[in-house]
Structure formats: C-alpha cells, structure tokens
Amino acid sequence: MTIAIKMGFLDGDPIVDDQGRLVGRGGGTALVERLLKMYPGAVVVDHEDRQFDGFEAKTLSSLDPLETLVINLDVIDSVGVFQTMHREGAEPKLLNLQWLPPSHYHHKVNFAAMVLAYALFPTLCSGERTAGEVTELVRRWTISPLAHQARIAWVQPGIRDDLVREHVDPEVPTVLYPAIHLTDNKQPKVFLDVMHRVASEKDVRMEVRLSQRDLASVMAMKMSSPKWASVGPLFGQREEYWEALARMTAFLATAKNEAYGFEYLEALVAGAVGVFPDAAWARKTVPEDYPYFYRTTDEAVSML
C-alpha cells in the first residue's frame, strides 16, 4: 500500500521548490514532513511526476487507486480527489487530515464541501477542539443518514524537537509574530498596535516571517514600516527556521482561535516567552500554571 500525502492544492502556490524541498506552510508542511518520516516510501501529490532527494512526487492520475491511501490535508476537495481516482471504476481510499480549524473557512459552499467530505471519508483532526468543530458541522450541515456514518477522531500531533538550537539572548529583545499568515483570525493589527506601544517605551525589535502571498499584502507593508521591524519570507530550510527561533526573546499570540498552536509550541521549546490571550484555546496549549495571559491590550503591553 502506497501512502500519498496531498496538501497545498487550494491556493495555487508551489508545493515543492526548485531545490526539491517542501515549501514552508507552517503547521501543514511540518505535518507532511512528519508523515514522510513515519511512512518510508510515501509520496507527495503534486502537479507532475518528479523524483526528489528523499521523496517522490506523483499526480493523482498516476496513482493506483487500489494500492494507494491518500491522506488529504486539503479536506475541502476530498470529493474531487475521489472522483479523479474513481474514473475507471476503482474505489479509492481517502483519509481527511483536518489540521486547520474548519472556521478557517467562511462561505457556505466551503462548509458544505467539507461536511460532505467528513461524512463520506474518515477524518483525523489535529486536536480535540478541531474534532468538536467538525462533529458540530456534520450535525448542522448534512442529512441524518450521512451524519450517522461520519467517522471522526483526533490526535495531538506534538512537534519535532530534534532541530532545536541552544537559546541565545539577542542584544536587543526581539518579539516574534508567531504565524505565517495575516488573516483576520490571527489579528495582525492587534499585534502591531501592541508592538508600537512597546517600542515607544523600550528598545525592541519585531520579527515577522510570512508566506509569499501575505508578503504582498497591505498589512505586511504596514508591519515592515517601523525601523524596529524585520519582515521577510519563510526560511527555505527547517534548520534556518530553528536557528532564528533560538534568537527570539518572546512572542505575542493574538489569534481568536487555533487548532493546536503548532508555531507557539515550537517557539516555546526554542526558549521564547509566549504572551497569550486569555482564551480557551491558549489555556489548552500550555500548562495550567503558565503565567502570561492577557485580557486587554494594556496587559499585553505590560507583559511584553
């Protein structure tokens, strides 16, 4: 049985770069790397068949439906994956890997597409909270016969710590924006407003690493304008990423909700101090006695 891992088909950006490395997509890329390590010989679904150093890429049409399990991180198009592989009548095997909270999407068509995928194919969620969202969507958005056949489970993925570097305190305290996107859920404006207030009182630097699409946004331009800000693209290699994390003093989390807080866990392991909103998702991310939770932006400024 071949394991085929599919991710990144929804935004049109490349999945693998010219050097044969997976393009950084935060938690999604890390999950793909984990799966490739867990299942030697697994392939990555791409737009063309290619051989890379350490793994192989194949198109959906070149996979044998009878001998392949597709683990789909793009759950919203699982039905389309099935239809592509079912053209000759074979019954393909699919597993939804819901690594983002479903609330990442907003349009009713997206919810309907996801719910149909949840009902038709088994779904593994990253964290109990995400599994709860998936279960509730299935209950609300689909008919009873389909809802009853949904198979939903969850796992706490954890993080890799084999690349962790020794923490180094920078000369100027550096605060990390702990995300690669500037979506409304991440509330980058709140982050930037807090940083402006901190920078008016203390000598501080801000570091932001964004996906290619987010780098071209108006919000990214605003974040890069202060002289104490450094805004750039994602690192090409995981080693570079961990070396940079080791030099972070702190990070400020401003998200409304998260699936399992992948970026926050990595930053904490690397030695950065995390300042979190006093929200249920954040409380579940760290130990019970963790001290740095803010209820207002004034408190966030004070803690930083």
Language-model regions: role of each:
Residues 101, 129-130, 147-165:
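Short beta-strand->alpha-helix junction loop in the catalytic core
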Residues 217-238:
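Nucleotide-activated donor-binding/catalytic signature segment of Leloir-type glycosyltransferases, i.e.
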Residues 107-150:
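A short, active-site helix/loop in glycosyltransferases that binds the activated sugar's phosphate group
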Residues 288-299:
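Conserved acidic donor-binding segment of nucleotide-sugar-dependent glycosyltransferases
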Residues 6, 165-186, 192-199, 207:
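Conserved donor-binding/catalytic core segment of Leloir-type glycosyltransferases
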Residues 255-256:
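Aromatic "clamp/platform" in nucleotide-sugar-dependent glycosyltransferases that forms part
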Residues 68-75, 83-105, 122-125:
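Active-site proximal beta-strand in glycosyltransferases
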Residues 204-219, 234:
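Glycosyltransferase donor-sugar binding loop
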